[in-house]
A protein has these predicted regions:
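Nucleotide and nucleotide-moiety/phosphate-recognizing core
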Residues: 2-12, 18-107, 116-117
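Flexible, gly/pro- and Lys/Arg-enriched active-site loops
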Residues: 56-67, 79, 83-203
Length: 203
């Protein structure tokens, strides 16, 4: 008897602040969403609108660096977290990502934020993403596409509402502003349960 693979919900954050051989920032986000949806064992179910945010470096906002376009994708995956993370790194490489500087500018950045609520900390992967709770550029588009979303706390003490985390992040660092970016939907799946959120609802 064939065993059915169990799908778990996953949250993936996308960002780009440099054009590349495959297009400008917006086009790179679109190509990344297409590539994620094409992965074996993965199906995208929803995507936020695109937002624009200032470049965040290790010592804070860098107003001299190109701004980022960011979005969040919801998907269902029948892979292990490690396999999915490896596949995301493969997409980054295919789209011209070169890992030279921590927190440096990049053509594409794909972060695995949450994987079915799992908590994991190994040399290879940390779930949930250890800095997602404080990043408005992740929380704002995530709240847009999934208003009732919760993020498990890494210390195992429960979960926090993404909407509440976003308010706290904006209060701590108002300079990390999130601005809607006018663009066509990153993903539509008419009749299959996929949705695309209106970028005008991001704040």
């Amino acid at each position: 008897m064939t065993r059915m693979r169990v799908e778990l919900p996953v949250v993936i954050a996308l960002g780009s602040n440099l054009p590349g051989d495959h297009g400008d920032r917006e086009q790179l986000l679109r190509l990344a969403v297409q590539a994620i949806d094409a992965l074996s064992g993965v199906r995208v179910t929803a995507a936020s609108g695109i937002v624009e945010t200032p470049a965040l470096k290790l010592d804070g906002v860098d107003e001299n660096a190109p701004s980022y376009l960011n979005a969040v994708v919801l998907a269902r995956a029948a892979l292990s977290p490690e396999m999915l993370l490896g596949a995301l790194h493969g997409i980054e490489a295919a789209l011209g990502r070169v890992r030279q500087e921590v927190w440096g500018d990049r053509t594409i950045d794909l972060d695995l934020i949450d994987f079915g609520g799992l908590r994991r900390a190994t040399e290879e992967i940390t779930l949930p993403h250890p800095r997602a709770w404080q990043r408005a550029f992740v929380l704002a588009p995530w709240r847009q596409v999934q208003p009732d979303a919760v993020l498990p706390k890494a210390d195992g003490t429960g979960s926090a509402r993404v909407a509440d985390l976003l308010l706290a992040a904006q209060g701590r660092a108002p300079e990390e502003r999130v601005t809607p970016f006018p663009a066509e939907p990153l993903f539509t799946a008419s009749g299959t349960g996929g949705v695309s959120a209106d970028p005008a609802t991001v704040s």
